[in-house]
Amino acid sequence: YRSALTKLAAPRIKKNRCIWLYCDSSKTVKDNAYYQFIHDCKKNDGIERYYICNKDADITGWFDDSQRAQLIEYGSVKHRLYALSADKILTSFYGLQDFLCYPNGAYKYFADLTTFELIYLQHGVLHAHLPTMYSLDRMAIDKEVVSTRFEVDNLITNYCFEDSFLIKSRMPRLKHIPKDKKPEKKILFAPSWRKFLVESDGKGGWIPKNAAFINSEFYKNVMAFL
């Protein structure tokens, strides 16, 4: 029944409409999709833009009244149907559960309805050497937004990208960096997470493995450094 309903409803939603969805993971964090959405909402180009938002996320002060009307709850029926009807999905996370709310394995029954172009917005400027994660052949994306010449050269040279896959528009979030704050002589030490110290919750999130973390060489080396 659900499959039949979706196959009937999705084409009706898509008819004579251009729909773009913006997603910042299934949990909703203020990342590049949020800033891209705020930037793009100012355009009057006939495109319907919607930001996918988790109902449990604290979004106080994020949106004005007009933007709030363009929010879609993650996992809702509307999200499921609009995901199938979208022309573009712009996401700062490229995991399937981060922008599509279909359970693992279920999406294949609806994939024939989709024609969306998946635009990866990244989180920032890629500087680490991670081709096993971010090479074009490892990611199910159509285009990637870049902000610097370094990224263009790096992705083409080390990540199997061709120039045609890169959108050189730069991240709108860079315009939100406060310019009135004076530089401070401080050093931020922020070790990145380690995949082997967490496990997936099956919904796009992660569950920490506390015992493994405490006993890991990663933890011991960080503490020794501090």
Language-model-derived ranges and their functions:
Residues 30-44, 172-226:
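Conserved catalytic-core segment of nucleotide-activated headgroup transferases in glycan assembly
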Residues 18-177:
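Active-site and donor-binding regions of nucleotide-sugar-utilizing enzymes
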Residues 1-19:
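Non-catalytic membrane-proximal stalk/linker segments that position and tether the catalytic domains
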Residues 2-6, 60-61, 220-223:
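Generic detector of well-ordered alpha-helical segments enriched in charged/polar residues
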